[in-house]
Amino acid sequence: MQHHHHSSYGGGGGGYPGQAYRQQQPYYGQPSPQPYAQPPPPNYQRPSGYGPPPSGGHMYQQGPPAPYQQHNSYQGGHGRPAPPPTDPVAFGHGAPQGYNFQYSRCTGKRKALLIGINYFGQKGQLRGCINDVKNMSTYLNQNFGYAREDMVLLTDDQQNPMSQPTKANILRAMHWLVKDAQPNDSLFFHYSGHGGQTPDLDGDEDDGYDEVIYPVDFRVAGHIVDDEMHRIMVNPLKPGTRLTAIFDSCHSGSALDLPYIYSTQGILKEPNLAKEAGQGLLGVVSAYARGDMGSMVSTAVGFLKKAAKGDEAYERTKQTKTSPADVIMWSGSKDSQTSSDAQIQGQATGAMSWAFISALRKNPQQSYVQLLNSIRDELATKYSQKPQLSCSHPLDVNLLYVM
């Protein structure tokens, strides 16, 4: 399959009855209290060995933890992984002092946006994408306390024009998802449909291409680029607000443009914050974090002067894409691979969302690295792709995965 920007497709293949959503919905009252929203008990002691990551090197104490070699046999004798710390955590790795991020405890409000596009009647029609988001929305509702009224589903089988996954509706819904979000909220974004690449205009992608998603009306309205998704859904978030994203599409490896990327082999990519701090790119951010507006103005002016000399595309527009919020993204394969789709139990299903649900159903209490390995094991039974986890901040992969 070729990979110019309009023909790299990932999607599903198995019919699904086009019945309205309402029919199979029982009455949804308040979700029963479940362990996901419980903060740790007041006298909870974090197990030893979970301190903040050492500054300087990678995050893993004494090399990668055992799950990297041994699938899910979690070595270390802790009954379960530690919950996320409640205090701000320094970015480290050469970032300026005071430049921190915060994990979300995911105890606050929950909102979800799920987009599934089968492209009915178009060239490159898919069959599994609407199914993917129906499965995911049911899973979120039944297991993670996302109320139906706090979820927006955009699928191209709906009669209501506002629920069609057009470019305008998708962008509007992305703004809705993050509006008024607070620390410890848990926002969820799922996209199943065609993805692809387009030549990168601002010089910020390693491979010279931006990742894009294709709304149902892309032939008229055009695609949506990763930079725009980052600007709408990541930039406005406060420290400690979680956004979890899952992409079932081709070329989705960097679809939210997050700078830290992890695989079952360890860290694949991290930004050089010391270098970027030296270029003044983090100066504005850290001054802002300290509330030091005077220095922020002078730093910003110096940075703009430097950028105006047009040192190169990198100097001009590269921001670190780090965020003090808690943004994570699960995607299949690497950017250079295509996302496979196949029949699962007679229905076409997006590989990533299916593996994510399957892995968490088997064991809801996993660390990030355990979950990466579990998802890899699920994918390996049916697919060629490997999972990766991208993050807006350095991630302690031994912490308990919460959502």
Curated annotation (Swiss-Prot):
Its EC number is 3.4.22.-. It comes from Aspergillus terreus (strain NIH 2624 / FGSC A1156). The active site is at H194, C250. It comes from the Eukaryota. PANTHER family: METACASPASE-1, METACASPASE-4. This is Metacaspase-1A. Keywords: Apoptosis, Hydrolase, Protease, Thiol protease, Zymogen. The gene is casA. Residues 1-93 are annotated as: Disordered.
